[in-house]
């Protein structure tokens, strides 16, 4: 997922180019504006964390581009491509990562990436109801 700062910062096409050049296939994509209820449901696992209200506010501050990516080892390769959560640290330790390119800090870090195959499956189904579970496991998709 390209977060609001990535979309509003006009990084969408650059990120998509990086994704394709890294060997991913963009299977599906959808530009959407999350409302509070949707953002809260998507990030439900973080609901007890102190940053949750700020995360929901941020994720509803502008449109996001949700994508389903396909590649062998998609989750781990995507995590490598986006870099560390904190964009400031990414600029030092992973200067060629997506978060180093367009992120600002640990929240406004431009992109979201599933942290596991099971998270990817849940997140893909959250936005793309027509993608069935077997397709995800077989084709090794990753929600972005």
From Swiss-Prot:
Enzyme class: transferase
Keywords for this protein: ATP-binding, Kinase, Nucleotide-binding, Transferase
Single annotated GO MF: nucleoside diphosphate kinase activity
GO BP: CTP biosynthetic process; GTP biosynthetic process; UTP biosynthetic process
List of residues binding ATP: 3, 51, 79, 85, 99, 109
Enzyme Commission identifier(s): 2.7.4.6
InterPro entries according to UniProt: NDK-like_dom, NDK-like_dom_sf, Nucleoside_diP_kinase
Catalytic residues (positions): 112 (pros-phosphohistidine intermediate)
Catalytic activity: a 2'-deoxyribonucleoside 5'-diphosphate + ATP = a 2'-deoxyribonucleoside 5'-triphosphate + ADP; a ribonucleoside 5'-diphosphate + ATP = a ribonucleoside 5'-triphosphate + ADP
Family under the similarity heading: Belongs to the NDK family.
Protein role: Involved in the synthesis of nucleoside triphosphates other than ATP. The ATP gamma phosphate is transferred to the NDP beta phosphate via a ping-pong mechanism, using a phosphorylated active-site intermediate.
Protein name: Probable nucleoside diphosphate kinase 5
